[in-house]
Amino acid sequence: MHHPFRTAAALAICAAGLFSMAVPALAAESFTPPDVSGKSVEELIDAFREEHNLDETNFELSYYNTVSGESYDYNETKLLYGASTYKLPLNLYYYDMQLAGEITGDTMITQGSSLDEAHYQSLVYSNNELSYSLWRRIGDWPEYKMAMRKYFTMTDDEIPQNYYYDHVFCTRMMMDTLKV
């Protein structure tokens, strides 16, 4: 059955959607990127911080160029609320166990979810339920946080006690994990 009103409404909605996507695309065409030639990462980040009024109270950064080896850190040991960042070292922990032959991708993490599926859901879709199942297999939160220490270069003296009990990490910890 043909419904001309529904067809027209659907076309209008599609046209509005396409138009709303075209406006930012057209604006992007007129954007002129800043000239960064001859500037170091530090100079670029310092200019960005100045432009956006960022300082050690509201900005933390760790940068590493995998091609050149260039790195830059700013306020990199300041602990901040971790959100889903805990999933990076958590998944690496299980990948290490797989490489050591201690566990396989077919190992069931929950009823119905293998380790391979848990990795995928945790890293691609940020699935909290499966990620929680992964860290609970290690132990409680302080035990999980202790197990993750093997990926970090920070010394015991550099890591405050609240690291073990709060959901906090710093950019240096995450960068260390990425470099493993």
Where are these regions (language model features)?
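Bacterial N-terminal signal peptides that target proteins for export
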Residues: 1-10
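Surface-exposed patches in mature extracellular/periplasmic domains of secreted proteins
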Residues: 56-63, 103-110, 131-135, 156-162
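Flexible glycine/proline-enriched surface loops and loop-helix/loop-strand junctions
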Residues: 72-77, 114-117, 125-131, 155-162
